[in-house]
Protein backbone atom coordinates (compact mmCIF):
# COMPACT_ATOMS: atom_id res chain seq x y z
CA UNK A 1 0.00 0.00 0.00
CA UNK A 2 1.33 3.47 -0.91
CA UNK A 3 2.45 5.55 2.07
CA UNK A 4 -0.05 8.28 2.92
CA UNK A 5 0.82 11.81 1.90
CA UNK A 6 -1.31 13.32 4.70
CA UNK A 7 0.53 16.26 6.26
CA UNK A 8 3.21 16.28 3.56
CA UNK A 9 4.42 19.71 2.37
CA UNK A 10 4.85 19.99 -1.39
CA UNK A 11 6.00 22.74 -3.73
CA UNK A 12 3.49 22.86 -6.58
CA UNK A 13 2.90 24.49 -9.93
CA UNK A 14 -0.83 25.18 -9.92
CA UNK A 15 -2.87 24.31 -13.00
CA UNK A 16 -6.45 25.06 -14.06
CA UNK A 17 -9.49 25.28 -11.85
CA UNK A 18 -11.60 22.14 -11.47
CA UNK A 19 -15.26 21.57 -10.74
CA UNK A 20 -15.68 22.10 -7.01
CA UNK A 21 -13.47 25.16 -6.66
CA UNK A 22 -10.05 23.53 -6.27
CA UNK A 23 -7.17 24.02 -8.66
CA UNK A 24 -5.35 21.05 -10.16
CA UNK A 25 -1.71 20.14 -9.70
CA UNK A 26 0.18 16.92 -10.43
CA UNK A 27 3.02 15.27 -8.53
CA UNK A 28 4.53 11.82 -9.11
CA UNK A 29 1.58 10.67 -11.18
CA UNK A 30 -1.02 11.81 -8.66
CA UNK A 31 -3.55 14.64 -8.95
CA UNK A 32 -3.77 17.18 -6.15
CA UNK A 33 -6.84 19.37 -5.72
CA UNK A 34 -5.52 22.54 -4.11
CA UNK A 35 -7.59 25.11 -2.19
CA UNK A 36 -6.53 28.74 -1.63
CA UNK A 37 -4.52 28.74 -4.86
CA UNK A 38 -5.09 30.24 -8.32
CA UNK A 39 -4.13 28.96 -11.78
CA UNK A 40 -0.53 29.73 -12.74
CA UNK A 41 0.73 30.19 -9.18
CA UNK A 42 3.62 28.41 -7.50
CA UNK A 43 2.80 27.51 -3.91
CA UNK A 44 3.81 25.42 -0.94
CA UNK A 45 0.86 23.23 -0.03
CA UNK A 46 0.04 20.86 2.81
CA UNK A 47 -1.81 17.66 2.00
CA UNK A 48 -5.02 17.67 4.06
CA UNK A 49 -6.70 14.52 2.77
CA UNK A 50 -5.30 11.32 1.28
CA UNK A 51 -7.54 8.30 0.97
CA UNK A 52 -5.17 6.54 -1.37
CA UNK A 53 -5.78 6.17 -5.05
CA UNK A 54 -4.95 8.63 -7.79
CA UNK A 55 -5.70 11.93 -6.04
CA UNK A 56 -5.53 13.80 -2.75
CA UNK A 57 -6.41 17.27 -1.44
CA UNK A 58 -4.18 20.07 -0.22
CA UNK A 59 -4.22 23.65 1.07
CA UNK A 60 -1.85 26.30 -0.27
CA UNK A 61 -0.09 27.53 2.88
CA UNK A 62 2.47 29.81 1.20
CA UNK A 63 2.38 31.61 -2.14
CA UNK A 64 5.82 31.59 -3.77
CA UNK A 65 4.75 33.20 -7.04
CA UNK A 66 1.31 34.78 -6.99
CA UNK A 67 -1.29 35.46 -9.66
CA UNK A 68 -1.97 39.01 -10.77
CA UNK A 69 -5.57 38.31 -9.81
CA UNK A 70 -4.77 37.49 -6.17
CA UNK A 71 -6.09 39.88 -3.50
CA UNK A 72 -6.17 39.94 0.29
CA UNK A 73 -9.36 38.15 1.42
CA UNK A 74 -11.88 40.48 3.10
CA UNK A 75 -12.31 37.84 5.82
CA UNK A 76 -9.24 36.63 7.78
CA UNK A 77 -10.89 33.22 8.19
CA UNK A 78 -10.86 32.60 4.42
CA UNK A 79 -7.52 30.83 4.76
CA UNK A 80 -6.12 27.35 5.43
CA UNK A 81 -7.53 26.06 8.69
CA UNK A 82 -10.27 28.68 8.69
CA UNK A 83 -13.94 28.70 7.72
CA UNK A 84 -14.99 26.35 4.93
CA UNK A 85 -17.74 28.53 3.48
CA UNK A 86 -15.86 30.60 0.90
CA UNK A 87 -13.55 29.25 -1.80
CA UNK A 88 -12.23 32.27 -3.66
CA UNK A 89 -12.02 35.33 -1.43
CA UNK A 90 -8.34 35.47 -2.46
CA UNK A 91 -9.33 36.24 -6.08
CA UNK A 92 -10.63 39.44 -7.65
CA UNK A 93 -14.44 39.20 -8.07
CA UNK A 94 -14.21 39.54 -11.86
CA UNK A 95 -11.62 36.76 -11.96
CA UNK A 96 -13.83 34.57 -9.77
CA UNK A 97 -16.45 34.83 -12.50
CA UNK A 98 -13.86 33.90 -15.14
CA UNK A 99 -12.98 30.79 -13.15
CA UNK A 100 -16.63 29.80 -12.84
CA UNK A 101 -17.14 30.34 -16.56
CA UNK A 102 -14.16 28.09 -17.27
CA UNK A 103 -15.67 25.34 -15.12
CA UNK A 104 -19.07 25.56 -16.85
CA UNK A 105 -17.44 25.50 -20.30
CA UNK A 106 -15.20 22.56 -19.35
CA UNK A 107 -18.12 20.50 -18.01
CA UNK A 108 -20.20 21.15 -21.13
CA UNK A 109 -17.33 20.10 -23.36
CA UNK A 110 -16.33 17.04 -21.34
CA UNK A 111 -19.77 15.65 -20.48
CA UNK A 112 -21.96 16.91 -23.34
CA UNK A 113 -19.46 17.37 -26.16
CA UNK A 114 -20.46 21.04 -26.52
CA UNK A 115 -17.88 23.75 -27.12
CA UNK A 116 -19.30 27.06 -26.00
CA UNK A 117 -18.02 30.37 -24.67
CA UNK A 118 -19.50 31.10 -21.25
CA UNK A 119 -19.78 34.41 -19.42
CA UNK A 120 -20.80 34.50 -15.76
CA UNK A 121 -22.80 37.66 -15.08
CA UNK A 122 -22.70 39.49 -11.73
CA UNK A 123 -25.89 40.22 -9.83
CA UNK A 124 -26.59 43.61 -8.29
CA UNK A 125 -25.25 44.24 -4.82
CA UNK A 126 -21.56 43.32 -4.98
CA UNK A 127 -19.66 40.30 -3.64
CA UNK A 128 -20.31 40.91 0.08
CA UNK A 129 -23.39 41.12 2.29
CA UNK A 130 -25.59 39.02 0.00
CA UNK A 131 -26.12 35.71 1.79
CA UNK A 132 -29.62 35.70 3.28
CA UNK A 133 -29.42 32.24 4.89
CA UNK A 134 -26.59 31.00 7.09
CA UNK A 135 -26.18 27.80 9.10
CA UNK A 136 -24.23 28.04 12.34
CA UNK A 137 -23.15 25.49 14.92
CA UNK A 138 -22.22 25.99 18.57
CA UNK A 139 -18.71 24.99 19.60
CA UNK A 140 -17.63 23.48 22.90
CA UNK A 141 -17.84 26.87 24.60
CA UNK A 142 -21.39 27.43 23.35
CA UNK A 143 -20.35 30.17 20.92
CA UNK A 144 -21.95 29.87 17.48
CA UNK A 145 -19.59 29.62 14.54
CA UNK A 146 -19.06 28.02 11.14
CA UNK A 147 -17.55 24.66 10.25
CA UNK A 148 -14.11 24.30 8.78
CA UNK A 149 -13.79 22.84 5.28
CA UNK A 150 -14.68 19.11 5.15
CA UNK A 151 -14.69 19.02 8.96
CA UNK A 152 -16.92 19.03 12.04
CA UNK A 153 -14.53 21.47 13.72
CA UNK A 154 -16.23 24.75 14.63
CA UNK A 155 -14.48 27.99 13.67
CA UNK A 156 -15.52 30.88 15.91
CA UNK A 157 -16.55 34.06 14.13
CA UNK A 158 -17.40 37.64 15.06
CA UNK A 159 -19.37 38.13 11.85
CA UNK A 160 -19.51 36.87 8.27
CA UNK A 161 -18.81 39.41 5.51
CA UNK A 162 -20.90 37.59 2.89
CA UNK A 163 -23.96 37.41 5.18
CA UNK A 164 -26.63 40.12 5.13
CA UNK A 165 -25.23 42.81 7.47
CA UNK A 166 -26.47 42.41 11.04
CA UNK A 167 -28.27 39.14 10.36
CA UNK A 168 -26.03 37.06 12.64
CA UNK A 169 -25.85 39.48 15.58
CA UNK A 170 -28.49 37.76 17.73
CA UNK A 171 -27.20 34.24 17.19
CA UNK A 172 -23.60 35.26 17.86
CA UNK A 173 -24.43 37.24 21.01
CA UNK A 174 -25.83 34.22 22.88
CA UNK A 175 -24.43 31.00 24.29
CA UNK A 176 -25.92 27.74 23.09
CA UNK A 177 -25.71 24.11 24.06
CA UNK A 178 -22.53 22.75 22.42
CA UNK A 179 -23.36 21.11 19.11
CA UNK A 180 -26.57 23.11 18.62
CA UNK A 181 -27.15 23.87 14.94
CA UNK A 182 -28.87 27.11 13.99
CA UNK A 183 -30.25 28.56 10.77
CA UNK A 184 -30.58 32.30 10.33
CA UNK A 185 -32.67 33.71 7.47
CA UNK A 186 -33.13 37.33 6.40
CA UNK A 187 -36.18 37.84 4.17
CA UNK A 188 -37.13 40.43 1.57
CA UNK A 189 -38.31 42.84 4.28
CA UNK A 190 -35.07 42.38 6.26
CA UNK A 191 -36.97 40.50 8.96
CA UNK A 192 -34.82 37.92 10.74
CA UNK A 193 -35.85 34.33 11.38
CA UNK A 194 -33.91 32.03 13.72
CA UNK A 195 -34.39 28.28 13.95
CA UNK A 196 -32.70 25.56 15.98
CA UNK A 197 -32.10 22.41 13.95
CA UNK A 198 -32.14 18.79 15.04
CA UNK A 199 -31.86 15.51 13.15
CA UNK A 200 -34.56 12.98 14.04
CA UNK A 201 -34.56 9.59 12.29
CA UNK A 202 -32.38 11.00 9.55
CA UNK A 203 -34.62 14.02 8.87
CA UNK A 204 -33.80 17.61 9.77
CA UNK A 205 -36.40 19.23 11.99
CA UNK A 206 -36.49 22.74 13.35
CA UNK A 207 -37.63 24.59 16.45
CA UNK A 208 -38.55 28.17 15.59
CA UNK A 209 -36.91 30.61 17.99
CA UNK A 210 -37.95 33.84 16.28
CA UNK A 211 -39.88 34.82 13.15
CA UNK A 212 -41.16 31.98 11.01
CA UNK A 213 -43.15 33.34 8.06
CA UNK A 214 -40.97 35.17 5.55
CA UNK A 215 -41.97 37.81 3.02
CA UNK A 216 -40.18 37.69 -0.32
CA UNK A 217 -40.66 39.70 -3.51
CA UNK A 218 -40.12 38.26 -6.99
CA UNK A 219 -41.82 37.87 -10.38
CA UNK A 220 -44.11 40.80 -9.64
CA UNK A 221 -45.61 39.09 -6.59
CA UNK A 222 -45.31 39.19 -2.81
CA UNK A 223 -44.63 35.75 -1.33
CA UNK A 224 -45.44 34.70 2.22
CA UNK A 225 -43.80 31.40 3.01
CA UNK A 226 -41.83 29.28 5.44
CA UNK A 227 -38.69 31.28 6.19
CA UNK A 228 -36.56 28.15 6.18
CA UNK A 229 -37.94 26.54 3.03
CA UNK A 230 -36.20 26.78 -0.33
CA UNK A 231 -35.67 30.29 -1.68
CA UNK A 232 -32.66 31.69 -3.50
CA UNK A 233 -30.13 32.94 -0.95
CA UNK A 234 -28.99 35.91 -3.07
CA UNK A 235 -31.57 38.73 -2.81
CA UNK A 236 -31.45 39.40 -6.57
CA UNK A 237 -31.42 35.80 -7.79
CA UNK A 238 -35.13 34.89 -7.67
CA UNK A 239 -36.23 37.87 -9.75
CA UNK A 240 -33.33 37.50 -12.20
CA UNK A 241 -34.12 33.84 -12.82
CA UNK A 242 -37.87 34.39 -13.03
CA UNK A 243 -37.49 37.07 -15.69
CA UNK A 244 -35.19 34.90 -17.78
CA UNK A 245 -37.61 31.97 -17.49
CA UNK A 246 -40.38 34.32 -18.62
CA UNK A 247 -38.35 35.30 -21.69
CA UNK A 248 -37.23 31.82 -22.69
CA UNK A 249 -40.31 29.77 -21.78
CA UNK A 250 -42.64 31.83 -24.01
CA UNK A 251 -45.52 29.50 -23.15
CA UNK A 252 -48.42 29.99 -25.59
CA UNK A 253 -51.78 31.37 -24.50
CA UNK A 254 -54.01 28.45 -23.60
CA UNK A 255 -51.04 26.08 -23.61
CA UNK A 256 -49.74 23.43 -21.24
CA UNK A 257 -46.60 23.86 -19.14
CA UNK A 258 -44.82 21.83 -16.47
CA UNK A 259 -42.84 23.29 -13.57
CA UNK A 260 -40.73 20.44 -12.17
CA UNK A 261 -39.00 20.67 -8.78
CA UNK A 262 -41.29 23.66 -8.40
CA UNK A 263 -40.45 24.80 -4.87
CA UNK A 264 -43.10 27.34 -3.88
CA UNK A 265 -44.05 27.99 -7.51
CA UNK A 266 -41.87 30.93 -8.53
CA UNK A 267 -41.64 29.71 -12.13
CA UNK A 268 -45.18 28.30 -12.08
CA UNK A 269 -46.43 31.84 -11.47
CA UNK A 270 -44.57 33.05 -14.57
CA UNK A 271 -45.91 30.18 -16.69
CA UNK A 272 -49.45 30.77 -15.42
CA UNK A 273 -49.31 34.39 -16.55
CA UNK A 274 -48.25 33.22 -20.00
CA UNK A 275 -50.78 30.42 -20.57
CA UNK A 276 -53.62 32.46 -19.08
CA UNK A 277 -56.83 31.20 -17.46
CA UNK A 278 -57.53 28.72 -20.27
CA UNK A 279 -54.11 27.07 -20.01
CA UNK A 280 -52.67 24.49 -17.64
CA UNK A 281 -49.57 24.56 -15.44
CA UNK A 282 -48.58 21.45 -13.52
CA UNK A 283 -46.25 22.07 -10.57
CA UNK A 284 -44.52 19.03 -9.05
CA UNK A 285 -42.61 19.40 -5.78
CA UNK A 286 -41.53 16.84 -3.18
CA UNK A 287 -41.50 19.19 -0.17
CA UNK A 288 -44.93 19.21 1.45
CA UNK A 289 -44.41 22.56 3.17
CA UNK A 290 -43.31 24.10 -0.13
CA UNK A 291 -46.45 22.76 -1.84
CA UNK A 292 -48.60 24.20 0.94
CA UNK A 293 -46.87 27.58 0.59
CA UNK A 294 -47.22 27.41 -3.19
CA UNK A 295 -50.92 26.59 -3.13
CA UNK A 296 -51.57 29.47 -0.76
CA UNK A 297 -49.48 32.03 -2.65
CA UNK A 298 -50.87 31.06 -6.08
CA UNK A 299 -54.48 30.64 -4.99
CA UNK A 300 -55.43 33.39 -7.47
CA UNK A 301 -54.14 31.24 -10.37
CA UNK A 302 -56.55 28.30 -10.75
CA UNK A 303 -54.72 27.17 -13.91
CA UNK A 304 -51.89 25.95 -11.62
CA UNK A 305 -52.37 22.45 -10.23
CA UNK A 306 -50.02 20.98 -7.64
CA UNK A 307 -48.70 17.46 -7.12
CA UNK A 308 -46.72 16.61 -3.99
CA UNK A 309 -44.09 13.92 -4.48
CA UNK A 310 -40.92 13.01 -6.32
CA UNK A 311 -40.79 14.14 -9.94
CA UNK A 312 -39.71 10.73 -11.21
CA UNK A 313 -42.77 9.15 -9.57
CA UNK A 314 -45.37 11.67 -10.76
CA UNK A 315 -44.23 12.86 -14.17
CA UNK A 316 -45.82 9.87 -15.91
CA UNK A 317 -49.28 11.29 -15.13
CA UNK A 318 -48.49 14.82 -16.32
CA UNK A 319 -50.83 16.31 -18.96
CA UNK A 320 -49.63 15.95 -22.54
CA UNK A 321 -48.88 17.21 -25.08
CA UNK A 322 -46.86 19.86 -23.26
CA UNK A 323 -45.63 23.09 -24.84
CA UNK A 324 -42.85 24.04 -22.42
CA UNK A 325 -41.12 22.45 -19.44
CA UNK A 326 -39.22 24.35 -16.75
CA UNK A 327 -37.13 22.34 -14.32
CA UNK A 328 -34.95 23.39 -11.40
CA UNK A 329 -33.61 20.12 -9.98
CA UNK A 330 -31.42 19.69 -6.90
CA UNK A 331 -27.65 19.62 -7.17
CA UNK A 332 -27.55 16.03 -8.46
CA UNK A 333 -29.59 17.03 -11.53
CA UNK A 334 -32.68 15.47 -13.07
CA UNK A 335 -31.13 12.24 -14.31
CA UNK A 336 -31.84 10.04 -17.30
CA UNK A 337 -35.26 8.75 -16.20
CA UNK A 338 -36.73 12.23 -15.74
CA UNK A 339 -35.12 13.47 -18.96
CA UNK A 340 -36.66 10.54 -20.83
CA UNK A 341 -40.09 11.31 -19.37
CA UNK A 342 -39.82 14.98 -20.32
CA UNK A 343 -38.81 14.07 -23.86
CA UNK A 344 -41.83 11.78 -24.18
CA UNK A 345 -44.03 14.85 -23.67
CA UNK A 346 -42.38 16.42 -26.75
CA UNK A 347 -42.20 20.01 -25.46
CA UNK A 348 -41.06 22.63 -27.94
CA UNK A 349 -38.90 24.34 -25.33
CA UNK A 350 -37.16 23.21 -22.14
CA UNK A 351 -35.79 25.76 -19.67
CA UNK A 352 -33.34 24.13 -17.28
CA UNK A 353 -32.25 26.03 -14.14
CA UNK A 354 -29.13 24.46 -12.63
CA UNK A 355 -26.96 24.99 -9.57
CA UNK A 356 -24.36 22.41 -10.61
CA UNK A 357 -22.63 22.63 -14.01
CA UNK A 358 -21.66 18.95 -14.09
CA UNK A 359 -25.23 17.79 -13.50
CA UNK A 360 -26.46 20.28 -16.11
CA UNK A 361 -23.96 19.01 -18.69
CA UNK A 362 -24.88 15.36 -18.06
CA UNK A 363 -28.58 16.11 -18.46
CA UNK A 364 -27.98 18.20 -21.59
CA UNK A 365 -26.26 15.15 -23.06
CA UNK A 366 -29.28 12.99 -22.12
CA UNK A 367 -31.61 15.50 -23.81
CA UNK A 368 -29.44 15.45 -26.94
CA UNK A 369 -30.19 11.73 -27.29
CA UNK A 370 -33.82 12.79 -27.85
CA UNK A 371 -32.96 15.41 -30.47
CA UNK A 372 -32.81 18.49 -28.20
CA UNK A 373 -30.04 21.03 -28.70
CA UNK A 374 -28.64 23.62 -26.31
CA UNK A 375 -29.64 26.85 -28.05
CA UNK A 376 -28.82 29.36 -25.31
CA UNK A 377 -27.18 29.51 -21.91
CA UNK A 378 -26.65 32.21 -19.31
CA UNK A 379 -24.75 31.93 -16.05
CA UNK A 380 -25.04 34.12 -12.95
CA UNK A 381 -22.77 34.74 -9.99
CA UNK A 382 -25.49 34.09 -7.43
CA UNK A 383 -22.91 32.89 -4.87
CA UNK A 384 -19.98 35.36 -4.88
CA UNK A 385 -16.78 34.30 -3.09
CA UNK A 386 -17.73 30.62 -3.49
CA UNK A 387 -17.22 28.24 -6.41
CA UNK A 388 -20.97 27.85 -6.94
CA UNK A 389 -22.68 29.24 -10.05
CA UNK A 390 -26.29 29.33 -11.24
CA UNK A 391 -26.95 28.48 -14.90
CA UNK A 392 -30.06 28.64 -17.07
CA UNK A 393 -30.11 26.61 -20.28
CA UNK A 394 -32.60 26.70 -23.15
CA UNK A 395 -33.07 23.46 -25.09
CA UNK A 396 -35.14 23.13 -28.24
Which functions belong to the PLM regions below?
Residues 131, 389-390:
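A structure-centric signal for secondary-structure junctions around beta-strands
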Residues 393-396:
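Conserved beta strand-loop-helix elements of the APE1-like EEP
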Residues 1-327, 332-340, 346:
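Accessory RNA-recognition modules of RNA-modification enzymes
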Residues 307-389:
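S-adenosylmethionine
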Amino acid sequence: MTESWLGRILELEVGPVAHGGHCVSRVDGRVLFVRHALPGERVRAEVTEDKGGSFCRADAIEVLSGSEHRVTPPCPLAAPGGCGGCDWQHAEPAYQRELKAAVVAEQLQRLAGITRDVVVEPLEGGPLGWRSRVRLVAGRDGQAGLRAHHSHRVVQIDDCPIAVPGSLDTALSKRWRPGTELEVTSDGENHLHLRELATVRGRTQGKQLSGGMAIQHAAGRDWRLDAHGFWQVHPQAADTLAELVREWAAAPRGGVAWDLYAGVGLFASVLADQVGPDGQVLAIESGRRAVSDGERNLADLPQVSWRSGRVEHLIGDAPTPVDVVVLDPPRKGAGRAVVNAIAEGEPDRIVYVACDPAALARDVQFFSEHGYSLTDLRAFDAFPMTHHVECVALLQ
